């Protein structure tokens, strides 16, 4: 029992968000976006607000070793899509658009 006292508790939704970001960096394709839609739906159905998902993804993406220019673009896109998600009705669409944009930024050679 002593071994578990020092381990921090990580909520399941944080683990899901880390998995989503890992997938984004592993493969940039339409098939990945389609696969990740299921993960987003699971988070949303379980009551995780889109704002938490956006901020969780942003924190995980910024941890990755990329250029400062890339990180600034990610922050800009996250704020743009989070704002659209708050003003719109279907959060899933804005989450998908955000990860598609991040995939485009990852492929862009000028930002890496």
Feature-to-residue mapping (PLM):
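AAA+ P-loop NTPase domains with strong preference for DNA replication initiators
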Residues: 1-112
């Amino acid at each position: 029992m002593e071994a578990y006292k020092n381990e921090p508790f990580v909520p399941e939704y944080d683990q899901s968000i880390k998995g989503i970001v890992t997938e984004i960096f592993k493969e940039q394709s339409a098939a990945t976006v389609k696969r990740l839609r299921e993960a987003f739906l699971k988070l949303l159905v379980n009551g995780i607000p889109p704002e938490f998902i956006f901020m969780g993804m942003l924190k995980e993406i910024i941890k990755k070793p990329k250029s400062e220019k890339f990180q600034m673009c990610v922050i800009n896109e996250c704020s743009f899509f989070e704002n659209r998600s708050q003003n719109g009705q279907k959060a899933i669409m804005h989450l998908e658009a955000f990860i598609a944009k991040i995939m485009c930024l990852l492929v862009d050679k000028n930002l890496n």
